[in-house]
């Protein structure tokens, strides 16, 4: 017996030492799961519900990520929700961008450092009023591809992308020490016509393969059986979305038909609504949002406020809806934090509601950032687009008997110039037509350097032009943003069908894909010899409605050595019509004061300089207020308040657009700019 004790004591000692260690490891193991017996989430074994807000890192400069996240935390949110736009990270097949403003991993780690959990929505389709719903345009190189389906070509591209993205996300899962508690599969799939369950099952398998079996995967659809019929899938937790205009009881009953047990979740509770060019700015009354949020939280539900901050559609990233209506540069969304990240009345009202249910962090709330009105900056005309083709298209044009689309000439965004000659004399006006509505989306038309007018998708498909036989016919075609929602997201751009002149098909095209980004960035010091402007002068005798599309440039200096400068600002375009604007080579986005409702564009301070003059480059497409008679009118103005809700005036009636079954009703009586607290 003593010998036996001698042999077993070391073993008992080892077990005693290992036992507590193993128990401690189990107690501290991070877990996030669904407790179906208590209709709740469990976070590390304890009942939990999230109060989240949407922020899209792709719409907020990295410079401001921490500021916005801190404000969200101080509002009482314990989580954030964000989309991952595929096209933001893979602009060309196999070419990936994950640095600077594209560094989604840093963004998620920053949220984690600030104590915020994350609801991740990696698509591959996201909607989000984002260009093509986040799907990369290069998918359309196969013209017959059926997006968001089990089409083999689509699945192959998706599989490759998920194989890049999801392994980056796995270390950031809550179970692995990160902030990500749930991951959405696809997005509102029940609103899409395909209803392809093989596609959803494929995604489910790939998400599980890359992320493991422990993470909570979910879907989101409108709170109606019509949407849930094709959007829900066994093995993915079903959630719904709805706004202030919905009956909350009925909405959650819709979820309960798919998920009899488990937490109630509104994945998109709308704090505001989206805008379209040529339609009034959408707002939702603060009282309505606060009241509905109270009712949702009183039911013990988890909720995500969409949006908590909307941000900006910089460059060409805005989407569009059908019938075709493009979204503007501002994605303010009438959210609790303004486009510029400023605190609003709605922010404090919702914070007050949240603190009735959860503890709100103590301490000061980061203030709204200061804004500065830098004033008027005079611009000078550089060159018309036609005169700058050597800069804009250095590789030369493409010849084709019939027009080619943007995709066919390897151009995804921006502009393409289509050129041919008039096959007949048009001394008397002759109809230039797109009989199949094939101008996607706007074409700025000129004959021998004399502007003729604009062809516009759905609105203007015929334009009378004049010119002699053999004259040069130019159409500068703009991609205004691909459709992001519904059945028509395979949105080809350019001249997607033939044009006719007096019913005769035009042929023998010379096509110039324009690299405006490289041209602007590499010519900030100027564009060499400048135009004499004689084309504009000649046109002035015929009409005051249009000038040739042209680039304009100006500079302004910000004093150095002053601690508070530079500051955020807003750029306004008095007298200008429609175009694109860059500051120091940074593409701010589209302006269109002639159509509205947005009149100013947000200019974040980090793109401004005090060490050197700041360069403004404007591409005006329709009419510029510039003439030799009064050069002071050729100017833009920097102001310290945004104007995103002007009265709407436009030259062609727009049809009403409805994104979802029952969008929140816009409130018409709000001030045109958000209050700053």
Swiss-Prot record:
Changing residue 59 to H: In GM1G1; with cardiac involvement in some patients; loss of galactosidase activity; severe mutation. Changing residue 173 to P: In GM1G1; loss of galactosidase activity. Residues 652-661, 668-677 have a biased composition (Basic and acidic residues). It comes from the Eukaryota. Changing residue 59 to C: In GM1G1; loss of galactosidase activity; severe mutation. Pfam families: BetaGal_ABD_1 (PF21317), BetaGal_gal-bd (PF21467), Glyco_hydro_35 (PF01301). It catalyses: Hydrolysis of terminal non-reducing beta-D-galactose residues in beta-D-galactosides. Glycans are attached at residues 26, 247, 464, 498, 542, 545, 555. Changing residue 83 to C: In MPS4B; decrease in galactosidase activity. This is Beta-galactosidase.
């Amino acid at each position: 017996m003593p010998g036996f004790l001698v042999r077993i004591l070391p073993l008992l000692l080892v077990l005693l030492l290992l036992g507590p260690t193993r128990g401690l490891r189990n107690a501290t193991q991070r877990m996030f799961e669904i407790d179906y017996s208590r209709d709740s989430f469990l976070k590390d074994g304890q009942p939990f519900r999230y109060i989240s807000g949407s922020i899209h890192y792709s719409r907020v400069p990295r410079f401001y990520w921490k500021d916005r996240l801190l404000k969200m935390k101080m509002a009482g949110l314990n989580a954030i929700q964000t989309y991952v736009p595929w096209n933001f990270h893979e602009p060309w097949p196999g070419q990936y961008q994950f640095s600077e403003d594209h560094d989604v991993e840093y963004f998620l780690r920053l949220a984690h450092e600030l104590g915020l959990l994350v609801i991740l929505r990696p698509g591959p389709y996201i909607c989000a009023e984002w260009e093509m719903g986040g799907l990369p345009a290069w998918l359309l190189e196969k013209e017959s591809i059926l997006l968001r389906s089990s089409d083999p070509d689509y699945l192959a591209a998706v599989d490759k992308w998920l194989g890049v993205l999801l392994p980056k996300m796995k270390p950031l899962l809550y179970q692995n020490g990160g902030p990500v508690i749930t991951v959405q599969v696809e997005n509102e799939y029940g609103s899409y016509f395909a209803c392809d369950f093989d596609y959803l099952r494929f995604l489910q398998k790939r998400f599980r393969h890359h992320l493991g079996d422990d993470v909570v995967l979910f879907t989101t659809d409108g709170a109606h059986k019509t949407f849930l019929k094709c959007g829900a899938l066994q093995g993915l937790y079903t959630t719904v979305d709805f706004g202030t205009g919905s009956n909350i009881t009925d909405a959650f009953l819709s979820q309960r038909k798919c998920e009899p047990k488990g937490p109630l979740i509104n994945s998109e509770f709308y704090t505001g609504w989206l805008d379209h060019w040529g339609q009034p700015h959408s707002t939702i009354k603060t009282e309505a949002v606060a009241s509905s949020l109270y009712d949702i939280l009183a039911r013990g539900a988890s909720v995500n406020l969409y949006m908590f901050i909307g941000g900006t559609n910089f460059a060409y990233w805005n989407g569009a809806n059908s019938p075709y209506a493009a979204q503007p540069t501002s994605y303010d969304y009438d959210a609790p934090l303004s486009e510029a990240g400023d605190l609003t009345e709605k922010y404090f009202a919702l914070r007050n509601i949240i603190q009735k249910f959860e503890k709100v962090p103590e301490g000061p709330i980061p203030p709204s950032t200061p804004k500065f009105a830098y004033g008027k900056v005079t611009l000078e005309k550089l060159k018309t687009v036609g005169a700058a083709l050597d800069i804009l298209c250095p590789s030369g044009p493409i010849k084709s008997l019939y027009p080619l689309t943007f995709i066919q000439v390897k151009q995804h965004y921006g502009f393409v110039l289509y050129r041919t000659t008039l096959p007949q004399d048009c001394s008397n006006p002759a109809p230039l037509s797109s009989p199949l509505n094939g101008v996607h989306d706007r074409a700025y038309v000129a004959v021998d350097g004399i502007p003729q007018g604009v062809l516009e998708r759905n609105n203007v498909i015929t334009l009378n032009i004049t010119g002699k036989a053999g004259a040069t016919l130019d159409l500068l075609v703009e991609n205004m943003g691909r459709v992001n929602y519904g059945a028509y997201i395979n949105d080809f751009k350019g001249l997607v069908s033939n044009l006719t002149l007096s019913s005769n098909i035009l042929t023998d095209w010379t096509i110039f894909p324009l690299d405006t980004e490289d041209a602007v960035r590499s010519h900030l010091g100027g564009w060499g010899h400048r135009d004499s402007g004689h084309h504009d002068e000649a046109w002035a005798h015929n009409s005051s409605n249009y000038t040739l599309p042209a680039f304009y440039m100006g500079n302004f200096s910000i004093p150095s050595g002053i601690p508070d400068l530079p500051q955020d600002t807003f750029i306004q375009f008095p007298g200008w019509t429609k175009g694109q604007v860059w500051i120091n080579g940074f593409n701010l986005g589209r302006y269109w004061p002639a159509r509205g409702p947005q009149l100013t564009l947000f200019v974040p301070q980090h793109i401004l300089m005090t060490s050197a003059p700041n360069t403004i480059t404007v591409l005006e497409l329709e009419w510029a207020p510039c003439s030799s008679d009064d050069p002071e009118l050729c100017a833009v103005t920097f102001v310290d308040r945004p104007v995103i809700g002007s009265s709407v005036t436009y030259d062609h009636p727009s049809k009403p657009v409805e994104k979802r079954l029952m969008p929140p009703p816009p409130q018409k009586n709000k001030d045109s700019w958000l209050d700053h607290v």
